[in-house]
């Protein structure tokens, strides 16, 4: 998807390809390690890059396109439409309200989307998990404690993730916190949580935190992703917990699919009904793939007994057998190298659903080659 958008080379230069992925007990003891999980030799290898840096890269590319304008400081108040156009009512810095009109409005305004609320009110089908997650970016020498680039720590009470973010030693540590805790309580308890969870049991002077962000975990989807000339995509359309990275990936897939539909309409190769297909397909992918897979990933980390997980969890058992079974390893590399598929890792060679979908197949003159 990033290659198609023309930004992959910049992303690769700014980020890095991670090496090993380890599943561990809460105290850091390894359970199983997947070496070179990216895999590094694939042209579609996993690349790690902080989201704020990715945003800057995308913004710089947008500025080079004469057909794109970026307006800062605009708060969406409402949306509307008639048979010929759609519009967004925004409040600019200073309080001035303005109407921005176009052929279509695409609401990509995040989990608290005002576009979605204008269409459906407070309706957002799904659930919120009991636990909350506290995401932090921190400088701490995890390498000295034998941690890999990606570490998933399994425990019903102390589940957390430790992942290298940058080449200069910045790490993401995200950990469980009681969902009933207030922001003040989360911040007050944070030093004790770090001392308990991190290797070496550090004190605040032993690490440098750049930011700390508690947030709730959700599994939710809007009733529709298309209402007339107004469409929803990414977090504005659906939410999932972060285990597996399906939120950001699904958002990219939405953007690719919606752009194909709008390009088809613009080129005269599709009518507006292709947007109904976008709504139908993307919602089906959320409910049939993103929601169950991300839920399964979260349950594996948050409810499993780390002492028995290799015996009871077929996915973890498969990971463990990779060291001895070259066929499983080959299947894993093949799947991870393919940009369009995900698999049930309990049987790595089985494709269960594609998170991408080619909407150019619905063009009236046959399958086209639409580009972003």
From Swiss-Prot:
Q: What induces it?
A: Expression is induced by methionine. Nitrogen starvation induces expression of terC and promotes terrein production during fruit infection, via regulation by areA and atfA. Iron limitation acts as a third independent signal for terrein cluster induction via the iron response regulator hapX. Finally, expression is under the control of the terrein cluster-specific transcription factor terR.
Residue sites binding FAD per the record: 76, 172-174, 215, 235
Enzyme nomenclature, EC number: 1.-.-.-
Q: What happens when the gene is disrupted?
A: Impairs the production of terrein.
Q: Which GO terms describe its molecular function?
A: FAD binding; oxidoreductase activity, acting on paired donors, with incorporation or reduction of molecular oxygen, NAD(P)H as one donor, and incorporation of one atom of oxygen
InterPro entries, alphabetized: FAD-bd, FAD/NAD-bd_sf, RIFMO-like
**Cofactor requirements of the protein:** FAD
Applications:
Terrein shows anticancer activity on various tumors including cervical carcinoma, ovarian cancer, and head and neck cancer. The secondary metabolite acts as angiogenesis inhibitors through the inhibition of angiogenin secretion. Terrein also has anti-inflammatory activity. It shows an alleviative function of age-related inflammation characterized as an anti-oxidant and might therefore be a useful nutraceutical compound for anti-aging. Terrein may enhance osseointegration by decreasing the level of ROS and has a potentially synergistic effect on osteoblast differentiation.
Metabolic or biological pathway, per its Swiss-Prot or TrEMBL entry: Secondary metabolite biosynthesis
Q: Keywords, A to Z?
A: FAD, Flavoprotein, Monooxygenase, Oxidoreductase
Q: Which Pfam families match?
A: FAD_binding_3
Q: Note the coiled coil stretches, chain numbering.
A: none
Asked if the record carries the keyword Oxidoreductase, the reply is yes
Instruction: Report the function annotation for this chain.
Output: FAD-dependent monooxygenase; part of the gene cluster that mediates the biosynthesis of terrein, a fungal metabolite with ecological, antimicrobial, antiproliferative, and antioxidative activities. The first step in the pathway is performed by the polyketide synthase terA that produces 4-hydroxy-6-methylpyranon (4-HMP), orsellinic acid (OA), and 2,3-dehydro-6-hydroxymellein (2,3-dehydro-6-HM) by condensing acetyl-CoA with two, three, or four malonyl-CoA units, respectively. 4-HMP and OA are not pathway intermediates, but are rather shunt or side products.
Its family remark reads: Belongs to the PheA/TfdB FAD monooxygenase family.
Q: What is this protein called?
A: FAD-dependent monooxygenase terC
Q: Organism classification, top ranks?
A: Eukaryota, Fungi, Dikarya, Ascomycota, Pezizomycotina
Q: Which gene encodes it?
A: terC
């Amino acid at each position: 998807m990033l290659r198609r958008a023309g930004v992959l080379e910049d992303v690769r230069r700014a980020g890095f390809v991670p090496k090993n992925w380890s599943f561990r007990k809460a105290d850091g003891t390894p359970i199983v390690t997947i070496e070179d999980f990216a895999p590094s030799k694939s042209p579609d290898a996993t690349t790690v890059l902080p989201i704020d840096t990715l945003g800057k890269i995308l913004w710089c590319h947008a500025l080079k396109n004469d057909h794109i304008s970026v307006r800062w400081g605009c708060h969406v108040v409402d949306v509307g439409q008639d048979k010929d156009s759609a519009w967004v009512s925004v409040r600019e810095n200073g309080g001035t309200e303005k109407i921005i009109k176009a052929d279509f409005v695409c609401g990509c305004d995040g989990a608290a989307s005002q576009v979605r609320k204008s269409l459906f009110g407070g309706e957002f089908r799904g659930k919120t998990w009991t636990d909350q997650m506290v995401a932090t970016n921190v400088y701490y020498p995890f390498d000295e404690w034998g941690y890999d680039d990606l570490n998933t720590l399994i425990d019903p009470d102390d589940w957390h993730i430790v992942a290298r973010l940058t080449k200069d030693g910045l790490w993401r540590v995200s950990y469980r916190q009681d969902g009933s805790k207030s922001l003040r309580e989360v911040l007050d308890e944070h030093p004790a949580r770090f001392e308990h969870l991190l290797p070496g049991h550090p004190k605040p002077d032993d690490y440098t935190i750049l930011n700390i962000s508690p947030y709730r975990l959700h599994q939710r989807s809007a009733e529709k992703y298309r209402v007339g000339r107004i469409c929803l995509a990414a977090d504005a359309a659906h939410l999932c917990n972060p285990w597996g990275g399906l939120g950001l990936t699904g958002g990219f897939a939405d953007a690719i699919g919606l752009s194909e539909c709008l390009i088809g309409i613009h080129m005269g190769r599709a009518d507006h009904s292709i947007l109904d297909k976008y709504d139908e397909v993307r919602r089906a992918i959320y409910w049939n793939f993103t929601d169950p897979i991300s839920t399964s990933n979260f349950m594996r980390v948050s409810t499993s007994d780390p002492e028995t997980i290799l015996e009871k969890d077929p996915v973890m058992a498969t990971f463990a057998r990779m060291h001895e079974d070259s066929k499983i390893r080959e299947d894993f590399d093949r799947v991870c190298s393919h940009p369009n598929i995900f698999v049930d890792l309990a049987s790595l060679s089985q494709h269960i659903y594609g998170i991408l979908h080619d909407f150019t197949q619905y063009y009236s003159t046959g399958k086209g080659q639409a580009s972003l």
